[in-house]
Amino acid sequence: MSGFDDPGIFYSDSFGGDNAADEGQARKSQLQRRFKEFLRQYRVGTDRTGFTFKYRDELKRHYNLGEYWIEVEMEDLASFDEELADYLYKQPAEHLQLLEEAAKEVADEVTRPRPAGDEVLQDIQVMLKSDASPSSIRSLKSDTMSHLVKIPGIVIAASGVRAKATRISIQCRSCHSTLTNIAMRPGLDGYALPRKCNTDQAGRPKCPLDPYFIMPDKCKCVDFQTLKLQELPDAVPHGEMPRHMQLYCDRYLCDKVVPGNRVTIMGIYSIKKFGLTSNRGRDRVGVGIRSAYIRVLGIQVDTDGSGRTFAGAMTPQEEEEFRRLAALPNIYELISKSIAPSIFGGTDMKKAIACLLFGGSRKRLPDGLTRRGDINLLMLGDPGTAKSQLLKFVEKCSPIGVYTSGKGSSAAGLTASVMRDPSSRNFIMEGGAMVLADGGVVCIDEFDKMREDDRVAIHEAMEQQTISIAKAGITTTLNSRCSVLAAANSVFGRWDETKGEDNIDFMPTILSRFDMIFIVKDEHNEERDVMLAKHVITLHVSALTQAQAVEGEIDLAKLKKFIAYCRAKCGPRLSAEAAEKLKNRYIIMRSGARQHERDSDRRSSIPITVRQLEAIVRIAEALSKMKLQPFATEADVEEALRLFQVSTLDAALSGTLSGVEGFTSQEDQELLSRIEKQLKRRFAIGSQVSEHSIIQDFTKQKYPEHAIHKVLQLMLRRGEIQHRMQRKVLYRLK
């Protein structure tokens, strides 16, 4: 090791050093010329039909519009010069700079002479696009570092647009010497200022350590933005958390996406410093550790909220197959049979879910307002009736599906939350479940277990299909164009026929936003029980055998693509005859509901309003969309009315108080009033008493037991009394 300390002679191989540098520069110049040749000479079309110079014309058009960018397809570059495309794929950071310089030279040639005031040539940003199959975030390992990658995902957070210096000038505080035009590396890498000033000034003392500072007014900057990308839900293995990746966008790629967008990213898999320090900055560990991010070179937004996840990736053969499928006369029954085939019964409910998956047509009115096309559905009733299983199936079947449970969902988790960005300390917004499901379906299980405050938060998302946020200085509106499929139990766990509408513990404001409300009862029917038991046992016995396609069913992958195709290609409207029929039936429906309210002397908790008329329109449009028809016919309206009849109308009339359990007469009303007054006399405010003893005492006085239950339920709903000690004791509040 003594040779390293020898101050005598220093040997170096100086031969060929300059030549090597010259060769590197010559290679870069040659590659730049080839890139320039590609941009100038690449053409589309044939000599017979006429051809155009694709990138040359695009550069000229964009430059004249003041848009200093161009999108290059990797397939075009590979067909022109495969070696160049290979260089760009394996060493994108180095060769992209040459491509941008070449684009700037071509832009200079095609835009001369430029108008007065615009003589200075602007830099051109090159964005990349490719038809190659994307890889997942999980597949990005160290061997793909600094390579070009293409990954899909959902944008869940976006920072504000900030400035980053591309060229800086620094000045010494002591001797005021300056170093100008220092190039900065693109991406999230910083720049380490020189520790010493190397200016030779005879007769002056040496400059101190760390003398340089940046001169902000002499720096050249570009816009940049950081995004947070999350794995697609269907790409996450069971039982694992979705992974995230930080994205760096600059110049014209800023503000191209918002949280909730499904995107495919083309970029360079890069690393940045990942300093691990203790609280006071001492004991640095992990010096060699780097955290990964992607420097974005191209963004493709996969969906515009219409569920077009698969529509662009379909072959002509698939499209032809789907058109033949839609032309089948029994397509409606075929689709409803394919909805959760392992679940027995519930035919009408499956047909309603089929309508929800296809959806109606979103309409934009001349005054700028919109009418939603998505259908919302509520399943309400007994436990053990496969409600959650249906929700799980719809999540898998929908082109975009998000499943959440009511108890574990907050208002912010469903809509959007505002968080502080750890790097910039600014507030940023992260979209919740209803924003991430834009263009698909949100499945909310245990809807009745949600807190009322959280349930109110989705009112706007269900009807207006937007989420308005005004928090921490951020005021904005996010899109949530999605259907809501909710499942809930009744107030008493099981549906109690004697309680009527008291089984439903939802406000009319939320119930009116559901297009269809199904009451699912576990009825005791021996014949049905035999068939159900046989079906369930068959499922358990044949669960491990190889899956075989059942005749008359569409398999899940094909159904998912068919739904996406229909949603993308078809937007039907009501025909004139169907509209007239619907108008007449709606008037009859309203009068029937009004008569029922008059007879029962109370307002129904499930109202029949204009929203329900629009619901029937949407159901009819969905039925027409399954057949890829431009207009909904009278038959579609008839089926939509039937579905509405067996769901919402039956639910609205389920609380009928006529017959044995009824209180429709004046005598019954007086009986209720008498029981309530006597109950309040012996039950002081602030006291508590056993519910069982009250019922026993009043029964001894010859009052009917169902009437006593009715009074207690009314007082509970009005908030005058409340249950305590596992619903055994009643406590009077007012």
From Swiss-Prot:
Predominant subcellular localization, coarse grouping: nucleus
Subunit structure: Component of the MCM2-7 complex. The complex forms a toroidal hexameric ring with the proposed subunit order MCM2-MCM6-MCM4-MCM7-MCM3-MCM5. Component of the CMG helicase complex, a hexameric ring of related MCM2-7 subunits stabilized by CDC45 and the tetrameric GINS complex. Interacts with ANKRD17. Interacts with MCMBP. Interacts with TONSL; the interaction is direct.
Enzyme Commission number(s) of this protein: 3.6.4.12
Family from the record: Belongs to the MCM family.
Motif stretch (Arginine finger): 512-515
Modified residues (Phosphoserine): S605
A Pfam family: MCM_N
Modification N-acetylserine occurs at: S2
GO terms, biological process: DNA replication initiation; double-strand break repair via break-induced replication
Residue positions binding ADP: R371
InterPro entries (alphabetical): MCM, MCM5, MCM5_C, MCM_CS, MCM_dom, MCM_lid, MCM_N, MCM_OB
Keywords, comma-separated and alphabetical: Acetylation, ATP-binding, Cell cycle, Chromosome, Cytoplasm, DNA replication, DNA-binding, Helicase, Hydrolase, Nucleotide-binding, Nucleus, Phosphoprotein
Official protein name in the record: DNA replication licensing factor MCM5
EC category name: hydrolase
Function: Acts as a component of the MCM2-7 complex (MCM complex) which is the replicative helicase essential for 'once per cell cycle' DNA replication initiation and elongation in eukaryotic cells. Core component of CDC45-MCM-GINS (CMG) helicase, the molecular machine that unwinds template DNA during replication, and around which the replisome is built.
GO CC terms: CMG complex; cytosol; MCM complex; nucleus
Subcellular locations according to the entry: Nucleus; Chromosome; Cytoplasm, Cytosol
Phylogenetic lineage: Eukaryota, Metazoa, Chordata, Craniata, Vertebrata
UniProt GO molecular function: ATP binding; ATP hydrolysis activity; DNA replication origin binding; helicase activity; single-stranded DNA binding
Residue positions where N6-acetyllysine is found in the record: K392, K396
Reaction catalysed by this enzyme: ATP + H2O = ADP + phosphate + H(+)
Domain MCM: 331-537
